[in-house]
C-alpha cells in the first residue's frame, strides 16, 4: 500500500485540511488536459536499475451526472524488473469541481498478487459518509461504512487538492497531520517540510523545489515513507520522489509535462 502513496503523497497538503466536513476548496494549480510522465528506478542489490515508467492525466468529466475532474495514475514495470517483481498499478479518482473527493479506486498487482481498493464518498448534514470496499489478494470482498465529521481523503484526491495550497511562510520542520482512506481503513498520515533544494529531472532541466516527507503512523510512531520534491511554482509538480519500500528503495524522476495551467517559474537557469 505504501508505495502507491508516493506519487500522491508527493503532493500532500500545504495547509491544515481536516478541521471539519466543509470540504470544498479552490483549484488554481491544474486544468483539464494535464499530462505528466516519469521514469522509475529500483535499487536492486545496491545497483540502481531502470524499473519502468509512470504517467498521470487529469481531465474534466462527469460523475453520477455532475461535472467532475477525473484523474488517473498508471505505473508499469519493464521486462527486466518483471523478472524480479511484477509491477502493474492503476489509480483512479473523481473529484468535484470544488475539489471534494467523490470516488477512488486502486488496482495493484505486486508479483502474483492482485488487489483492489475503492472508496465512495457522499456528503450529508455536515458529515462525510464513506463506503469502503477491498478485494484482497485471496479473492475476499471486504466492505466498511463510516460516517465522520471531518474531511477525509484518499491518496489521489489529496494530490489534486493539495496542489493549490500555499506554502509561503513555512519553516523547515513544519508538520501537518491529515487522514487518508483506503478500501478498509482511515489512517493518520503526516507531511514534514524541509526547505528548498534544486533538483535535476530526467528531461535535463533543473528545478527549484520544495522538499517534503510523507510519514505514516505505525505502532504508535510515524515512519517516513517517501521524500519528495515539488516544483516551487503555482503548479506544484512532483519533480523527484525517493521511496523507502519494504522490498528495497525506488526513485521517480519527471520526464515530461504538458497541459499545465500556470507558467513553470521554478526552472533554474
What do these predicted regions represent?
Residues 11, 149-153, 248-251:
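Low-complexity, intrinsically disordered regions enriched in charged/polar residues
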Residues 124-180:
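Active-site/ligand-binding surface loops and adjacent short beta/alpha elements
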Residues 17-21:
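Sec/Tat signal peptide C-region and signal peptidase I cleavage site
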Residues 8-16:
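Bacterial N-terminal signal peptides
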Amino acid at each position: 500500500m505504501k508505495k502507491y502513496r508516493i506519487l500522491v503523497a508527493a503532493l500532500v497538503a500545504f495547509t491544515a485540511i481536516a478541521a471539519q466536513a466543509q470540504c470544498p476548496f479552490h483549484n488554481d494549480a491544474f486544468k483539464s488536459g494535464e499530462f505528466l510522465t516519469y521514469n522509475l528506478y529500483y535499487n536492486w542489490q545496491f545497483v540502481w536499475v531502470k524499473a519502468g515508467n509512470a504517467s498521470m492525466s487529469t481531465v474534466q468529466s462527469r460523475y453520477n451526472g455532475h461535472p467532475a475532474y477525473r484523474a488517473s495514475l498508471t505505473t508499469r514495470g519493464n521486462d527486466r524488473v518483471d523478472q524480479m517483481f511484477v509491477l502493474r498499478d492503476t489509480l483512479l479518482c473523481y473529484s468535484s469541481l470544488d475539489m471534494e473527493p467523490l470516488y477512488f479506486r486502486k488496482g495493484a498487482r505486486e508479483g502474483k498478487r492482485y488487489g483492489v481498493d475503492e472508496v465512495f464518498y457522499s456528503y450529508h448534514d455536515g458529515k462525510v459518509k464513506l463506503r469502503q470496499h477491498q478485494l484482497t489478494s485471496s479473492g475476499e470482498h471486504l466492505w466498511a461504512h463510516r460516517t465522520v465529521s471531518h474531511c477525509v481523503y484518499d491518496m489521489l484526491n489529496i494530490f489534486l487538492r493539495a496542489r493549490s495550497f500555499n506554502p509561503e511562510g513555512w519553516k523547515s520542520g513544519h508538520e501537518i497531520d491529515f487522514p487518508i482512506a483506503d478500501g478498509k481503513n482511515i489512517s493518520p498520515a503526516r507531511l514534514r517540510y524541509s526547505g528548498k533544494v534544486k533538483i535535476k529531472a530526467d528531461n535535463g532541466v533543473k528545478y527549484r523545489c520544495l522538499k517534503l516527507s510523507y510519514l505514516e503512523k505505525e505502532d504508535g510512531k510515524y515512519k517516513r515513507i517517501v521524500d519528495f520534491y515539488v516544483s516551487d511554482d503555482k503548479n506544484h509538480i512532483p519533480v523527484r520522489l525517493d521511496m523507502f519500500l519494504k522490498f528495497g528503495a525506488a526513485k521517480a524522476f519527471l520526464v515530461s509535462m504538458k497541459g499545465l495551467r500556470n507558467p513553470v517559474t521554478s526552472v533554474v537557469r
